[in-house]
């Protein structure tokens, strides 16, 4: 009986720990996907393309699995919060940027939910992206 209990306990511990390793790996890969989309957005400097890159980064990260989707949400939320703080400092409580922030969050959610990020792709954006 003790041997059986020990085997069950060990299998549970190993099963849970392997899930954590998977989650952590997915989160790291998802964070990299988000960084790559941000880098591409900076490199492209293409007018009206930010929503596409938001959706693409979140989409790519979420495709990694639950860890990637979690990383995408955390990074997206942190970015929007920090942007709101800088808007308050720069413009005061004028509401400047609130609509853009909401549109960014909608694009983020669109991508995380598995919908095609090309929905936000502006005409003429180079195929490289």
Swiss-Prot record:
GO terms for molecular function: heparin binding. One of its GO terms (biological process) is acute-phase response. Residues 19-44 are annotated as: Important for amyloid formation. Belongs to the SAA family. One of its GO terms (cellular component) is high-density lipoprotein particle. It is found in: Secreted. This is Serum amyloid A-1 protein. Residues 1-18 form the signal peptide. Keywords: Acute phase, Amyloid, HDL, Heparin-binding, Secreted, Signal. Major acute phase protein. Gene3D superfamilies: Serum amyloid A protein. PROSITE patterns: SAA. Detected in liver. InterPro entries: Serum_amyloid_A, Synovial_Prolif_Regulator. Homohexamer; dimer of trimers. Can form amyloid fibrils after partial proteolysis; the native, undenatured protein does not form amyloid fibrils (in vitro). Apolipoprotein of the HDL complex. Binds to heparin. The lineage of its organism: Eukaryota, Metazoa, Chordata, Craniata, Vertebrata. SAA2 is more amyloidogenic than SAA1. Its main location: secreted. It is linked to Reactive, secondary amyloidosis is characterized by the extracellular accumulation in various tissues of the SAA protein. These deposits are highly insoluble and resistant to proteolysis; they disrupt tissue structure and compromise function. Residues 92-129 are annotated as: Disordered. Induction: By bacterial lipopolysaccharide.
């Amino acid at each position: 009986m003790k041997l059986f209990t020990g085997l069950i306990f060990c299998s549970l511990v190993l099963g849970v720990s392997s899930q954590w390793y998977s989650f952590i790996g997915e989160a790291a890969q998802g964070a990299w996907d988000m960084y790559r989309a941000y880098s591409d957005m900076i490199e492209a400097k293409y007018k009206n393309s930010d929503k596409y890159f938001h959706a693409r980064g979140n989409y790519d990260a979420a495709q990694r699995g639950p860890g990637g989707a979690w990383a995408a949400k955390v990074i997206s939320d942190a970015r929007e919060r920090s942007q709101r703080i800088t808007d308050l400092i720069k413009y005061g409580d004028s509401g400047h940027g609130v609509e853009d922030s909401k549109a960014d969050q909608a694009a983020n959610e669109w991508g995380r939910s598995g919908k095609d990020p090309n929905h936000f792709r502006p005409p003429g954006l180079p195929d490289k992206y």
